[in-house]
Amino acid sequence: MPDVTLTTLQGLKQKGEKIVMLTCYDATFAKTACDAGVEMLLIGDSLGMVLQGHDSTLPVTVADMAYHTASVKRGNRGAMIVADLPFMANATTEQTLNNSALLMQAGAHMIKLEGTAWLAESIRLLADRGIPVCAHMGLTPQAVNLFGGYKVQGREEAQAQQMLEDAKSLEAAGAAMLLLECVPSELAARITRAVQIPVIGIGAGSDTDGQVLVLHDMLGLSLSGRVPKFVKNFMREHGDIPAAIAGYVKAVKAVEFPAAEHGFSA
């Protein structure tokens, strides 16, 4: 697979071809995902839950993220690597710059930050220094305690309108991509149409520019036994892991996944 760049992603959005992203935490799965056609590998702080066994992403450290980013880089075969900046790793300007630099040096091509309009300053800071940023909006797991749990965001019209305005402001600040998690499908479609940058969804309907799932979820693996509504177990239809990942890629590209049953209404 030729190297995926921001230009590649922008071209896919303009053509209306869906972008496929999958979380990944090690070299072997990175190669397997690339061989299946996955275009973006996300080293998510979800590793705190699916690998480390925590009940949230909050305990994950920058050192954890750098270790797994470097592991994924070794197995990567052309996908764009996106790494999460973990909880409070961007609390100050100095921390934002230093921690983002560590993840870029470990092999990331883009840094993902969770938040709303207040992220604009951090996004400008990084973009001005040549670091692409993905802004993660909607249900942001690092704020789970503020939300009172893992709940759909943007169902009320005022909140939906604010999210739409926030998306525009983060694009204006220099965000290279947006990720929308657990928002009503109609709102995600509105945001996707309102911005020029690619929009990736998870639990955000089929009208975003691309999709992402947690690797363990789409393989039917769960420590807690809880399966989010937006997840499909691709192992049920395929005989092995490479085939399951290839099935996920095919389903996203064909706009067969997510189906209506995987989304949320306002």
Curated annotation (Swiss-Prot):
Free-text function comment from the UniProt entry: Catalyzes the reversible reaction in which hydroxymethyl group from 5,10-methylenetetrahydrofolate is transferred onto alpha-ketoisovalerate to form ketopantoate.
EC number(s) stated in the UniProt entry for this protein: 2.1.2.11
Gene Ontology biological process: pantothenate biosynthetic process
Species of the source: Stutzerimonas stutzeri (strain A1501)
Gene3D superfamilies linked to this entry: Phosphoenolpyruvate-binding domains
Binding-site positions, 3-methyl-2-oxobutanoate: 45-46, 84, 112
Cofactors demanded by this protein: Mg(2+)
Family: Belongs to the PanB family.
Keywords (A to Z) from UniProt: Cytoplasm, Magnesium, Metal-binding, Pantothenate biosynthesis, Transferase
Molecular functions (GO terms): 3-methyl-2-oxobutanoate hydroxymethyltransferase activity; magnesium ion binding
Keyword Metal-binding appears in the UniProt entry: yes
Residues bound to Mg(2+): 45, 84, 114
A matching Pfam family: Pantoate_transf
Main localisation: cytoplasm
Chemical reaction(s) catalysed: 3-methyl-2-oxobutanoate + (6R)-5,10-methylene-5,6,7,8-tetrahydrofolate + H2O = 2-dehydropantoate + (6S)-5,6,7,8-tetrahydrofolate
Name assigned to this protein: 3-methyl-2-oxobutanoate hydroxymethyltransferase
Pathway participation: Cofactor biosynthesis; (R)-pantothenate biosynthesis; (R)-pantoate from 3-methyl-2-oxobutanoate: step 1/2
Quaternary structure and interacting proteins, as annotated: Homodecamer; pentamer of dimers.
Cofactor note: Binds 1 Mg(2+) ion per subunit.
Enzyme class: transferase
Positions of transmembrane segments: none
UniProt xrefs under HAMAP family: PanB (MF_00156)
Catalytic center residues: 181 (proton acceptor)
Compartmental location: Cytoplasm
Top-level division of the source organism's lineage: Bacteria
Any one annotated GO CC term: cytoplasm
InterPro entries found in the cross-reference section: Pantoate_hydroxy_MeTrfase (IPR003700), Pyrv/PenolPyrv_kinase-like_dom (IPR015813), Pyrv_kinase-like_dom_sf (IPR040442)
